């Protein structure tokens, strides 16, 4: 594999908050941060340009508060956006400890903490060899960070959007609950939408389909899985037009 060139020169990686929590129920697992920053360092060493969208579910889950009427949907979503900023700060520092220059770009203006998101600036940074972490989702309530990942991937002209999960791809049903669950090696966007497989929310899938940007779902805990995907190896589940 070391003799091959990467299949993709620019990617968008989606890291959910739950993935960052690792084996914990909440919070950030430092081992996950360390492993992921190392994987990204390997990609940068191969010249791959990397954009990252992080979720916030490991720090804030608003469903219960909203259910109990303590906060409204808009407020809850805004709290979730702020949680992604905290995750982004942690990921930025993990990357910079490996001497990888990293930009933290927010869809919400947060003066002294991040810079405001601009697709033109992001592409410029990526071309200069910097990693860009995109936080605060789309900046709007009612949109998931999965949708934000697809949107940012399209805006920065990524060749592939990768979703890092705790399972090794997409199954016809939850493999943690059903021993007979069947894994898909490949699916079309239409099949995902028709079967409602839950790869990402429907808005995110529709965006990728409309702009013909492939999606790869892989197990972030499997050694070298991220590198394998970018090198074009068979890993996880591919969703395509």
UniProtKB/Swiss-Prot annotation:
Family affiliation: Belongs to the UMP kinase family.
Record's GO cellular component terms: cytosol
Assembly behavior: Homohexamer.
Record-listed ATP binding positions: 14-17, 57, 61, 165, 171, 174
Function: Catalyzes the reversible phosphorylation of UMP to UDP.
Protein name (record): Uridylate kinase
Signal among keywords: no
Residue numbers binding UMP: 56, 77, 138-145
InterPro entries linked to this entry: AceGlu_kinase-like_sf, Asp/Glu/Uridylate_kinase, Uridylate_kinase, Uridylate_kinase_bac
Gene symbol of the encoding locus: pyrH
Enzyme class: transferase
Subcellular location, record wording: Cytoplasm
Inhibition and activation profile: Inhibited by UTP.
GO biological process: 'de novo' CTP biosynthetic process; UDP biosynthetic process
Pathway: Pyrimidine metabolism; CTP biosynthesis via de novo pathway; UDP from UMP (UMPK route): step 1/1
Originating species: Psychrobacter cryohalolentis (strain ATCC BAA-1226 / DSM 17306 / VKM B-2378 / K5)
């Amino acid at each position: 594999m070391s003799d091959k060139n990467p299949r993709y020169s620019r990617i968008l990686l989606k890291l959910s908050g739950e993935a960052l929590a690792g084996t914990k129920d909440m919070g950030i697992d430092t081992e996950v941060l360390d492993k992921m920053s190392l994987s990204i360092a390997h990609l940068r060493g191969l010249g791959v340009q990397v954009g990252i969208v992080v979720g916030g579910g490991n720090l804030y889950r608003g469903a219960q508060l909203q259910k109990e009427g303590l906060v409204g949907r808009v407020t809850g979503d805004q709290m979730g956006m702020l949680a992604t900023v905290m995750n982004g700060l942690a990921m930025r520092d993990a990357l910079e400890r490996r001497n990888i220059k990293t930009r933290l770009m927010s869809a919400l203006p947060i003066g002294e903490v991040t810079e405001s998101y601009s697709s033109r600036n992001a592409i410029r940074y990526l071309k200069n060899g910097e990693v860009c972490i995109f936080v605060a989702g789309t900046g709007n309530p009612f949109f998931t960070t999965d949708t934000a990942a697809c949107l940012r991937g399209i805006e920065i002209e990524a060749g592939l959007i990768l979703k890092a999960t705790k399972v090794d791809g997409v199954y016809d049903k939850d493999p943690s609950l059903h021993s007979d669950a069947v894994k898909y090696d490949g699916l079309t966007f239409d099949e995902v939408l028709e079967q409602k497989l839950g790869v990402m929310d429907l808005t995110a899938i529709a965006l990728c389909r409309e702009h013909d940007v492939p999606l790869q779902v892989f197990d972030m805990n499997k050694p070298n899985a991220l590198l394998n995907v970018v090198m074009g190896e068979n890993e996880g589940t591919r969703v395509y037009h």
